């Protein structure tokens, strides 16, 4: 659910924030297509990654990349900052799903389909929770800008937490070297 929360808050509200930060800019309608371009690039790149190692490191990296995209947009609410943030947010989007599904196949080969449904539902819970959370932040802060900033900080924090959980899992439950990933 952390990836769903991090993605939906950013993808939904970053264009709104950009409109407030860059009023009248002719590039405002380009942020969604840039995110889509990042998704396409990420989808192509993720299929080129060898699936022989511990995918939890790749999942952590994807979470960190999305958190970085949010941080850049917060640190630099400028045209270059929003361009970078939009494009980079999209890059790990499909890779997260692809790597997570491969990890499910490794952990639960006999019941992978059920677990894939479960993680999809959990991702959806994060997506559902995001917009109401933003609404609460907007009501509880002094300005709309402060509410959006806090919401994006929470989204980035959720992604960093998700990455740290994956890294913690690699230490707590290392892959068994006698049964390495087979490259499925």
Where are these regions (language model features)?
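Helical-face signature of the major facilitator-like transporter fold
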Residues: 4, 70, 78-90
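Intracellular juxtamembrane helix-capping segments at the cytosolic ends
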Residues: 95-108
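Extracytoplasmic gate region of multi-pass secondary transporters
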Residues: 1-33
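Helix-to-loop junctions at the C-terminal end of transmembrane segments
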Residues: 42-55, 138
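Structural signature of the two symmetry-related core transmembrane helices
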Residues: 57-72
């Amino acid at each position: 659910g952390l990836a769903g929360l991090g993605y939906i808050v950013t993808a939904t509200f970053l264009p709104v924030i950009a409109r407030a930060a860059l009023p009248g800019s002719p590039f405002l309608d380009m942020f969604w297509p840039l995110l889509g371009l990042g998704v396409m690039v990420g989808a192509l790149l993720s299929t080129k990654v060898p699936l022989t190692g511990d995918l939890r490191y790749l999942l952590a990296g994807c979470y960190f990349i999305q958190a970085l995209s949010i941080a850049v947009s917060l640190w630099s609410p400028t045209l270059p900052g929003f361009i970078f943030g939009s494009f980079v947010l999209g890059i790990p989007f499909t890779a997260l799903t692809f790597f997570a599904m491969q990890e499910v196949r490794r952990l639960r080969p006999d019941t992978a389909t059920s677990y894939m449904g479960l993680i999809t539902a959990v991702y959806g819970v994060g997506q559902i929770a995001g917009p109401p959370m933003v609404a609460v932040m907007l009501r509880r802060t002094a300005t709309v800008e402060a509410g959006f900033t806090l919401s994006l900080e929470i989204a980035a924090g959720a992604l960093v937490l998700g990455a740290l959980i994956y890294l913690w899992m690699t230490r707590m439950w290392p892959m068994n070297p006698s049964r390495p990933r087979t490259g499925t």
